[in-house]
Design a protein with these regions (language model features):
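Short, small-residue-biased leader/transition segments that mark boundaries at the very start
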Residues: 2-13
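Extracytosolic ligand-binding ectodomains
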Residues: 11-411
Length: 411
């Protein structure tokens, strides 16, 4: 019976793969026909070509806890491609074309020198899959004065505040936006007593700082704050160490800051008291998730899966938004000059649909994209913030993250 069941599952998996390949083939044929029609009709009418650089840095592969999640070396790539396709849908009718060049700087190469070469070659628009330190260095280069960097990965709050730059805008949400989104939901559920567990990494501390600010902002009590500093292999010791680590605290919910996933997954079902896990594990605030299906998101999920063969990640989504932002601005102002594009991006008239029920737009005081934040469990969508009842004189989306009066950014 086991062999029959196993064979049945194998056949089902093969059929699913076959169906996926067939749909992908149909999509490619349809795209080729559209491209052929478009090139025949509009090739002679191209009046404006916008060049975009997608720049990323090769990373050393980190140690993983399991092999369940694949290590991706193409994050952002397929999001960029979908963004270009969507831009061309309107662009061809307007005589606009978009070309993207993918640049991955190797471990041995100097990122700053490679970036300077690209600027010298005449490129203006850069979609950047880089960390906070790299973004800060590139935006501070004297050669970077007349370019636009679009951040699709880093959540670091300082890049939106004291270290903000007029040549750097952010599609990726900040730590404060994510923590505010989560906190609003926890307040709604009346889970107001937190046990905060913080990892040892720099990113963990940055996320924890944002969580503490959100707790203060929404009148949450952090009953206990502990740093996870165990070096043992949790696959063998979790059942012994975690109950002792979490014992003796009166709390409603455990909030975890473990950005690299070094220990957070082991906390569930092992705490001394039966409590839910939220934060970087468990119920997680994010700008995109594979379970998101509302507001036409299913269409985007299916398009991405057929193109890439995998689920869309937050970085993939941010890459798509970044390219769409440029395309929308070029279409509206009928120009691709930097000054014209930036003026429109920060104007009240700018906004694009992004499969989240409302148009997303940029905050003109720090260059951050205001957007709804999804609250997702590993296999289900739970809620979307801002939560009902949180009001703002300009936009309810500005209840998430640093508002203009609080901002230390000076553009």
């Amino acid at each position: 019976r086991d062999r029959v069941a196993s064979r049945g599952l194998g056949d089902l998996y093969k059929r699913q793969i076959q169906q996926l390949e067939e749909r992908k083939k149909i999509d490619l044929e349809r795209k080729k026909k559209r491209d052929d029609r478009g090139s025949k009709k509009f090739a002679k009418d191209i009046k404006l070509t916008t060049d975009i650089i997608f720049i990323t840095k090769e990373r050393e592969v980190p140690a993983v806890l399991s092999n369940l999640d694949p290590i991706l070396n193409d994050e952002g790539f397929y999001g960029i491609q979908l963004g270009v396709e969507d831009n061309l849908t309107t662009g061809r009718f307007l005589g606009h074309d978009y070309k993207v060049k993918m640049i991955q700087v190797s471990l041995k190469e100097d990122l700053e020198e490679e970036f300077k070469k690209l600027i010298k070659s005449g490129y203006t628009y850069f979609v950047a899959d880089l960390n906070s330190g790299e973004l800060s260095k590139l935006s501070n280069l004297k050669e970077s004065k007349n370019i636009l960097l679009i951040n699709i990965r880093s959540k670091e709050d300082s890049l939106r505040n004291e270290f903000c730059k007029t040549n750097l805008i952010h599609v990726a949400p900040s730590y404060t936006m994510l923590s505010d989104a989560l906190t609003q939901y926890l307040v709604k559920k009346k889970w107001k007593k937190w046990f905060l567990v913080i990892g040892p990494e720099k990113e963990d501390k940055a996320y924890a700082d944002a969580l503490k600010k959100s707790a203060k902002k929404f009148n949450i009590k952090i009953k206990e704050e502990r740093v996870w500093d165990f070096a043992s292999d949790l696959r063998r010791t979790a059942q012994k160490e975690i109950p002792i680590f979490t014992k003796g605290v009166n709390y409603d919910i455990m909030v975890v800051a473990d950005e690299k996933g070094e220990f957070g997954e082991y906390l569930s079902y092992r705490t001394w008291d039966p409590r839910l896990i939220v934060g970087s594990q468990g119920l997680k605030p994010t700008n995109w998730h594979r379970t998101h299906e509302q507001w036409g998101a299913t269409q985007m999920q299916n398009r991405f899966r057929r193109k890439s063969g995998r689920w869309m990640t937050p970085v993939d989504y941010s890459a798509w938004v970044a390219v769409r932002v440029i395309g929308e601005a070029v279409s509206r102002v009928q120009d691709n000059k930097l000054q014209s594009i930036k003026e429109y991006l920060f104007s009240e008239g700018f906004g694009i649909g992004a499969y989240k029920g409302v148009k997303v737009s940029f905050r003109n005081w720090n260059g951050q994209l205001r957007q709804p934040i999804l609250l997702a469990a590993p296999r289900s969508m739970v809620s979307v913030s801002p939560q009902e009842g949180y009001l703002h004189p300009t936009s309810e989306l500005d209840t998430l993250g640093v508002d203009e009066p609080e901002s230390s950014c000076i553009f």
